[in-house]
């Protein structure tokens, strides 16, 4: 028996690429611009995809488009499918010389990152490094969703799908405007921290919980320099790696205070999915990380 299938009813790879772009960009116009398609084509393909799956994938509103519950479920599969397609290409096209795009995420305060990136670029100039900043929890999620090839995060972590590589360990310092600091000040002075998902914030909150202290106020930021400059102006106090505040401390604009050893250090690890295809560019990147980790240990 021969089944006649209409060509326009078959889900194509480009439909998944369009769907992913609209989901990421939040609008048809932005997705069309990113993919270099006309808007009407993007709209038609999304509508066709919804008809084929017999479910709405997006909510339409004046500000753009957001995923429905079914759309969010669809996005997980689309990320995986497109990642598998990329890996399929890599298996056959990957040459001995590292090349292509390497999408790397990182928390803001990896002191060894510039050295690692510089060394890697000098050794492998044919690799296009794409760097994305974020918080530990969101970077883990993006690695798991195949949106990033790997990421530098605050660790260590335990996850069955993730493997990790040691990068560095740093001291955490409490940073204040005043030279003297008493632990009771946590109840009278605002805490300046990154959003939830930051490793330093987790350490600070654990310390305060163990001490039975309730901070007066928590003010959230997403830029390190804004936090440090706000501390220098007397807005509040924060906890960050020593290397991140060295320049302001040396200039006398802020003062650093050691905290109990139990909470006083943070490790940076590089993570990737265990089941991701190991390209030559990633293998070389891990080798560069390992070399600099050994240098730091000497």
UniProtKB/Swiss-Prot annotation:
Residues 11-68 form the HTH lysR-type domain. It holds the Pfam family HTH_1. Coiled coil: none annotated. Residues 28-47 bind DNA. Keywords: DNA-binding, Transcription, Transcription regulation. One of its GO terms (molecular function) is DNA-binding transcription factor activity. PANTHER family: HTH-TYPE TRANSCRIPTIONAL REGULATOR (PTHR30126), HTH-TYPE TRANSCRIPTIONAL REGULATOR GLTR (PTHR30126:SF40). Belongs to the LysR transcriptional regulatory family. This is HTH-type transcriptional regulator CzcR. It comes from Bacillus thuringiensis (strain Al Hakam). The lineage of its organism: Bacteria, Bacillati, Bacillota, Bacilli, Bacillales. The gene is czcR.
